[in-house]
């Protein structure tokens, strides 16, 4: 369908001919008149291994600089890389391509690009081939996509296909690449609702670059069909290129694998720690690695069947058995994967991702745990942070990673500890799950393995190992981690918001938000544009509509004859709807009326103080805890506010004190709160992506709020200066989910009231203990010590009572099949006494004990000595059945169990039932 798109003057004027690949059937352009295949794997093998294709070798830094300088000389503006966590996107967690930097606002034409044309080297992370990393010799989780982009409009073209092709060819020529070795393969591209013709740049079996010419958008009525979808022309059109930095380096060196080209020092270090020799100057060994990489280019090695096939082919080609080859390759592949994964983690953690069980944090933890598992397999006994430190030393272009390294180390210590704990707990969880499937005679299914990993972090390899001990089979695909990564790679699609009164509102203009122009004004006049169901739409308003975690303003709307209370304000597609209280149903307002609005000043100021305080506390937390701190959510109320922060551990009391002190210092500095409307591009360039802590607002213009050093895109109401906020008091913190700390605080009058409440509690407590407030800690500590001593004495006394009671109970025991059975109601005993008595009786192997009490509600305890256990008596089963009769429940171990209920009238029935069950078991 796009065949005509490739009929370029560039090809015609530079000696190219269009051919059809005899292997894959795709069309390609080449200067080599004798070429029969397209140059892509698997149609062509990797012939660059051992045969570098450029005139010189490059390392990563040298290649990146060569590329960017080349395009600067060709009129492109170099721009800085974006983070690998896509802070500017709400549909994507990780940056997967350079074009993702400019989606959706630049690519849609809403916002101008930061430069045009531009060049960038963008670090990207893709986990969809996670299981192929290390095995294939070429796959990476993290790679830099070098790119040159041009953003064109129909009335203003920067450059298009012809010049893009010329630039690419000139770059390759400047590297002294043999022109006959280059193929340009036609391959239509589609993704993310866009499409266009695409050219793959192929050399010696390796895809070095992809040139996408994005000029189509998904359209059910479109006339262009690509991969089963219809498209139509876009208003703008974009040159979207991607050159693989790491592949250029590999091709320049001709190393056996991409890992040896990129990280030779780290690979050698890890090989040594694993007790392996990595002698690339040994031609036989180097040939094994090279042949493995060459043949891996022909297949997907993430699947076991293909991996085995690869092993067979490599073994056959070098005259070695498959088992011997596997013994050589498997540990080497793990070293390669560890090297790659730790580089990936350097970018992830260095750019502020906090490992957790959700979103980008989940993906970071996935990579961490997979790495730790492989390190365990190879018995590499160094901290993860040591390997990351090696990477950071090799990346001077990223000084931020060195600055953040202390936090990275701390995060990894925490994550390794969690991983070890998971492994310990995981064994018990798997045993329980495997026991269930053993009863049914089934293998543990993939869905259960996925659940075990998602919910508990238990890797499938461990599940297989533990389950096999119980005799239960486990099978999982070799691309298990790729599947998991793909499942969690994208944000959940938001349900399309149902706009109430959509038909009613769609004809109305957007409401002017006058409170932005005059933030301190609270009274105003407005024209009624519509009124329905106690809802009023005005031409302009000073009422803030609920949004950004800030509740709506309240107040009144008045006519000459009546005053109506405003109880809610919401915004729908830019139209602000005021809901009024109208209990008698008589509404004396009509379209076109001029009304007077009055905002509740106390509520507005209280919420503005809390909103401004949220910025202040966020900034203080970042300064105390580290630059990784990211706002994960916020909500303001009149009496307090809460701020959710991404952080890898609990905030300590000392850190909270520092945050609170720093926040109040910012208040006392009385800095002006600055708000301004800026173009999105300008704001991002000046302030970075910390702008989007509160979410990503739409539009070309965004409202930027500066509170001290905190700068965010924010639509809320704020104080005119930090001094107006008043005192800030942190009330409490809690961990609401893994990786997220919630900080609750109050500001202004609410903070004073909170402090007064705390003072009252202290005063009342001091009064109760008859000591001055300043002596309260010492007094509480003394009383607590005395209480602990009394508790110990009480426990000793209960043990003595239990021992004394044992002889009496044994004397009244019943004989059942050679066992002594005690069934006794002890009304005065608490649960601890019952437990100690039953435990004491466990010393007698032939005794079964059934005890009950109603001193603390109905309590039941059962125990069974060793002889009783061998007869089939199970204390847990006894208690479960007895507890049912007293309207309760219970359970425990076969030797000792506890339970209870709410019906004391059935205690004797429960004891009788227990005795009956013992007799049945002894038959």
From Swiss-Prot:
The keyword Mitochondrion does not apply. Binds 1 zinc ion per subunit. Its EC number is 6.1.1.7. Zn(2+) binds at residues 611, 615, 714, 718. GO terms for biological process: alanyl-tRNA aminoacylation. NCBIfam families: A-tRNA_syn_arch, alaS. This is Alanine--tRNA ligase.
């Amino acid at each position: 369908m796009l065949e005509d798109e490739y009929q370029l003057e560039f090809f015609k004027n530079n000696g190219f001919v269009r051919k059809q690949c005899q292997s894959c059937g795709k069309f390609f352009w080449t200067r080599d008149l004798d070429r029969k295949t397209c140059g892509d794997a698997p149609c062509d093998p990797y012939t660059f291994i051992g045969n570098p294709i450029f005139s010189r070798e490059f390392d990563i830094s040298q290649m990146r600089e060569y590329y960017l300088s080349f395009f600067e000389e060709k009129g492109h503006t170099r721009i800085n890389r974006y983070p690998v966590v896509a802070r500017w996107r709400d549909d994507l967690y990780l940056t997967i391509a350079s074009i993702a930097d400019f989606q959706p606002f630049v690519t849609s034409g809403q916002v101008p690009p930061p430069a045009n044309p531009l060049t960038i080297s963008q670090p990207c992370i893709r986990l969809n081939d996670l299981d192929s990393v290390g095995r294939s010799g070429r796959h990476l989780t993290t790679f830099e996509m070098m790119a040159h982009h041009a953003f064109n409009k129909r009335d203003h073209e920067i450059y298009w296909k012809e010049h893009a092709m010329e630039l690419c060819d000139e770059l390759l020529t400047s590297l002294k690449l043999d022109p006959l070795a280059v193929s340009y393969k036609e391959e239509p591209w589609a993704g993310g609702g866009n499409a266009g013709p695409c050219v793959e740049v192929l050399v010696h079996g390796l895809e070095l670059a992809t040139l996408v010419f994005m000029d189509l958008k998904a359209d059910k009525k479109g006339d262009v069909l690509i991969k089963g979808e219809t498209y139509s022309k876009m208003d703008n059109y974009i040159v979207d290129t991607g050159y693989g930095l790491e592949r250029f380096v590999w091709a320049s060196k001709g190393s056996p694998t991409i890992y040896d080209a990129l990280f030779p020092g780290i690979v050698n270090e890890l090989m040594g720690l694993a007790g392996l020799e990595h002698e690339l100057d040994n031609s036989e060994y180097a040939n094994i690695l090279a042949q493995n990489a060459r043949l891996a280019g022909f297949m997907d090695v993430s699947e076991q069947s293909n991996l085995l096939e690869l092993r067979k082919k490599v073994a056959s080609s070098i005259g070695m058995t498959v088992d011997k080859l596997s013994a050589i390759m498997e540990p080497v592949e793990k070293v390669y994967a560890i090297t790659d994964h730790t580089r990936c983690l350097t970018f992830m953690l260095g750019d502020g991702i906090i490992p957790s069980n959700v979103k980008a944090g989940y993906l970071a933890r996935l990579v961490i745990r997979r790495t730790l598992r492989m390190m365990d397999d190879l018995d590499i006994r160094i901290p993860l942070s040591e390997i990351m430190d090696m990477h950071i030393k090799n990346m001077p272009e990223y000084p931020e990673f060195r600055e953040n390294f202390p936090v990275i180390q701390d995060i990894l210590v925490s994550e390794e500890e969690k991983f070890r704990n998971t492994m310990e707990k995981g064994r018990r969880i798997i045993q329980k799950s495997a026991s269930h499937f053993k009863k049914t005679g089934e293998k543990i299914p993939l869905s259960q393995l996925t659940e075990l990993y998602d919910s508990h972090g238990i890797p499938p390899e461990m599940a297989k190992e533990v389950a096999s001990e119980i005799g239960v089979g486990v099978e999982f695909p070799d691309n298990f981690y790729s599947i998991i990564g793909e499942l969690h790679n994208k944000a959940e699609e938001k349900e399309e918001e149902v706009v109430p009164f959509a038909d009613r509102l769609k004809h109305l203009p957007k409401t002017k938000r006058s409170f932005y122009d005059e933030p301190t004004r609270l009274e105003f006049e407005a024209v009624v544009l519509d009124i329905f169901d106690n809802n009023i739409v005005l031409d302009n308003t000073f009422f803030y509509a609920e949004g950004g975690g800030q509740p709506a303003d309240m107040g009144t709307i008045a006519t000459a004859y009546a005053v109506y209370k405003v109880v809610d304000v919401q915004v729908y597609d830019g139209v602000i709807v005021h809901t009024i209280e109208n209990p008698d149903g008589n509404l004396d307002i009509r379209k076109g009326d001029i009304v007077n609005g009055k905002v509740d000043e106390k509520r507005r100021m209280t919420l503005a103080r809390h909103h401004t305080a949220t910025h202040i506390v966020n900034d203080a937390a970042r300064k105390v805890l580290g630059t990784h701190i990211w706002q994960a959510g916020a909500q303001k109320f009149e009496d307090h506010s809460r701020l959710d922060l991404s952080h890898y551990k609990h905030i300590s009391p000392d850190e909270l004190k520092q945050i609170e002190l720093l926040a109040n210092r910012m208040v006392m500095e009385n800095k002006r709160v600055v708000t301004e409307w800026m173009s999105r591009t300008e704001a991002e360039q000046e302030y970075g992506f910390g702008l989007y802590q509160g979410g990503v607002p739409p539009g070309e213009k965004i409202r930027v709020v500066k509170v001290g050093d905190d700068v965010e895109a924010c639509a809320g109401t704020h104080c005119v200066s930090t001094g107006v906020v008043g005192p800030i008091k942190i009330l409490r913190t809690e961990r609401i989910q893994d990786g997220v700390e919630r900080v609750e605080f109050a500001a202004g009058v609410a903070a004073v009231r909170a402090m007064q409440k705390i003072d009252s509690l202290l005063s009342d407590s001091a009064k109760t203990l008859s000591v001055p407030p300043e002596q309260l800690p010492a007094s509480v500590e003394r009383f607590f010590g005395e209480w602990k001593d009394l508790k110990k004495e009480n426990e000793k006394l209960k043990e003595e009572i239990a021992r004394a009671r044992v002889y009496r109970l044994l004397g009244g025991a019943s004989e059942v099949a050679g066992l002594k059975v005690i069934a006794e109601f002890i009304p005065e005993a608490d649960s601890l006494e019952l437990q100690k008595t039953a435990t004491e009786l466990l010393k007698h192997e032939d005794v079964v004990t059934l005890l009950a009490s109603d001193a603390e509600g109905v309590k039941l305890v059962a125990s069974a000595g060793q002889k009783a256990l061998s007869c089939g008596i199970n204390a847990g089963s006894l208690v479960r059945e007895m507890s049912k009769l007293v309207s309760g429940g219970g359970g425990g171990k076969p030797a000792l169990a506890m339970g209870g209920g709410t019906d004391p009238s059935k205690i004797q029935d429960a004891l009788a039932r227990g005795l009956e069950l013992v007799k049945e078991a002894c038959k």
